[in-house]
A protein has these predicted regions:
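Flexible coil/turn residues that form the inter-helical turn or adjacent wing/linker of helix-turn-helix
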Residues: 180, 191-192, 205, 220
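Basic, Lys/Arg-enriched alpha-helical interface segments
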Residues: 1-95, 105-108, 118-154
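Recognition helix of helix-turn-helix/homeodomain-like DNA-binding domains
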Residues: 203-218
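DNA major-groove recognition helix of helix-turn-helix/homeodomain DNA-binding modules
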Residues: 220-238
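Short amphipathic helical patch at the helix-1/turn junction of helix-turn-helix
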Residues: 99, 178, 188-190, 218
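N-terminal flexible/basic segments that precede or flank functional cores
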Residues: 140-182
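Short basic helix-loop element that most often maps to the first helix and adjoining turn
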Residues: 182-201, 226
Length: 240
């Protein structure tokens, strides 16, 4: 298990935490997929090679054939010494992003979230570049940075509980298909496979793998069984 924590930005605020808290209230549908992604990230430790290169988990979730409801993690800083990433969630005409970096303490992986924002369609007012640069500066000064560790008001577990107070979010995250999607993701991580690896081995498209890991309820049980078989998991489903 990895740990999700929050780090204060240059305004001395746990801005990413506050953003997620507002997202739960104001955009619960988008928050649902974001939390599915965060819960998967918790199960995925980043592997660090002797060269210093990090093998980062790829989280790519899709719900529906149109791919209008999706989430993806991408690396926005490619240098070895700056492992800065972004989690992008897209729902209809809205696009929100969370910027974070990876840190290590012994064998523990920490995903440190600093900034959250909605992507502005106007390039002249969009804050993406300035937020990314700010997170890079926070990362470079991370030894001095104040984190949410030990602060019960800003723990990921606290935020998760707030999300589950929303019946719609709880209904999805605790559903059979979403739980199975998280399990498929964790087994793929254990095997150190990418989504493309799993797609090739299961003879399914990468889009279908993204939908399975998201727990898309519109997919058939047969597809879930097929992927579980490839992952070496015996899955028997029955209807009461």
């Amino acid at each position: 298990m990895a740990k999700i924590i929050f780090v204060k930005d240059e305004q001395n605020e746990f801005q990413a935490y506050d953003f997620l808290q507002n997202l739960i209230v104001e955009e619960p549908l988008m928050a649902t997929l974001v939390f599915q992604g965060l819960l998967q990230l918790e199960t995925a430790e980043t592997r660090k090679l002797s060269t210093g290169k990090q093998i980062l988990p790829d989280v790519h979730l899709i719900i529906g054939k149109s791919q209008a409801y999706s989430l993806q993690t991408t690396r926005i800083e490619t240098t070895v010494d700056q492992p800065i990433q972004e989690m992008k969630a897209h729902f209809k005409d809205k696009n929100c992003r969370l910027i974070y970096f990876t840190a290590f303490s012994g064998d523990e992986t920490y995903y440190c979230f600093v900034k959250g924002y909605f992507k502005d369609k106007n390039p002249f007012t969009d804050q993406m570049s300035s937020y990314r640069e700010e997170v890079k500066r926070v990362f470079l000064r991370r030894i001095e940075a104040e984190t949410s560790i030990g602060n019960s008001d800003y723990q990921f577990e606290t935020l998760k509980n707030k999300a589950l107070e929303n019946e719609g979010i709880a209904h999805y995250l605790e559903s059979f298909s979403a739980s199975l999607g998280k399990y498929i993701f964790s087994k793929r991580m254990e095997k150190k496979w990418s989504q493309l690896d799993l797609a090739l081995k299961s003879d399914l498209s990468p889009v279908i793998i993204g939908r399975l890991e998201a727990g898309d309820p519109d997919l058939t049980l047969r597809m879930y069984q097929k992927v579980c078989t490839v992952l070496g998991v015996k899955a028997t489903f029955s209807v009461d």
